[in-house]
Amino acid sequence: MCHFNELSIEIESKNLRSAKKIFHCPYEECGKKYSRPSLLEQHLRTHSNERPFVCDYTGCSKAFYRKSHLKIHKRCHTNVKPFSCHYDGCDAQFYTQQHLERHIEVHRKPKPYACTWEGCDECFSKHQQLRSHISACHTHLLPYPCTYQDCELRFATKQKLQNHVNRAHEKIISYSCPHESCVGHEGFEKWSQLQNHIREAHVPSCSICGRQFKTAAHLRHHVVLHQTTLEERKTYHCPMEGCKKSFTRSSALKKHISVIHEGNMAFHCDSCGTKFGYKHMLQRHLERGTCKKAHKPYINECGIKHDGIEGVAIHDQKEKELSSNLVSDVAKKIINEVTGHGYKEAREYSCSFPECNYRFKRLYDMHRHLNSHH
């Protein structure tokens, strides 16, 4: 039996090499396409300007497209700079490899402007850099004063003055709404303000079927269903000999291998001890009342004995339904177990495909319906 971690790496690399780019960006005039839904999802963030990875440090509201970018950003809070300059006499350190490479270019450029102060060997590629160096390090002059009323601060360079003005005196619009209907909007200072605006003013909706969603991420997952068939979405194939199963997500494939081929049963019934590989199978076991462990029977108000308290609740519910005279037990059973139609209030999950009126109580059941019918 293969080790699970090694097998996961093998699965990932194998599918990356063989996968076809079948997931197309739904935005007009964008011809991007990808081999996996996750890559398409990552790309779509550049259209919606969605940055789900938010820094959780107190007072910091910066957000990023990718988790790796957030990880790099957090180094500025911990002051971890793993990339160091290798030039002799230079102790500069940086948060990223890109910043280090940019710094190294400074060493490689010619530096014709040398400081003439006694004992100073600094050289610079620009004359303005030399002037700023002399003001800050030798004459200690601060030639750039803040011109705002009641502010007496001065700075050695124009850039430091501008940074001060932006931070202390002027409202900086860092984020603007990407939707065309918001052209001319003044924008937002914080990422969180932009996200609140988008949630309230621009509810994500499918351009194909018109269905609305709570988040852009839910919409992206939905769009993929319109663009491909189920078989096209199943790009993750089980590598175990004799197994022809395939899946739409790598996580589903890993779970399949863990449960079916390695026999890992993480969920068990507290009453009878029966083990299950999937949580929904345990839930179904509990809902159906198939637990065979002997226990004291429960008696309801009608004097009827039941194997468990769940049986009492089911009986009482049936009595209530009969008294309401809405539908017969036979009709209810057909509706509940066969058609999936009706009882809109109790079935919050509806099929998103046009002309399909199926509704479901559980999200899991809706996914099974989509995979088998669409």
UniProtKB/Swiss-Prot annotation:
Gene Ontology biological process terms from the UniProt entry: transcription initiation at RNA polymerase III promoter
Family matches, as InterPro entries: Zinc_finger_trans_reg, Znf_C2H2_sf, Znf_C2H2_type
Pfam families hit by this protein: zf-C2H2
GO cellular component, one term: cytosol
Record-linked SUPFAM superfamilies: beta-beta-alpha zinc fingers (SSF57667)
Alphabetized UniProt keyword annotations: DNA-binding, Metal-binding, Nucleus, Repeat, RNA-binding, Transcription, Transcription regulation, Zinc, Zinc-finger
GO MF assignments: 5S rRNA binding; DNA binding; RNA polymerase III general transcription initiation factor activity; zinc ion binding
Disulfide bonds: none
Function: Is required for correct transcription of 5S RNA genes by RNA polymerase III. Also binds the transcribed 5S RNA's. Initiates transcription of the 5S ribosomal RNA gene.
Protein name: Transcription factor IIIA
Organism: Schizosaccharomyces pombe (strain 972 / ATCC 24843)
Source species taxonomy: Eukaryota, Fungi, Dikarya, Ascomycota, Taphrinomycotina
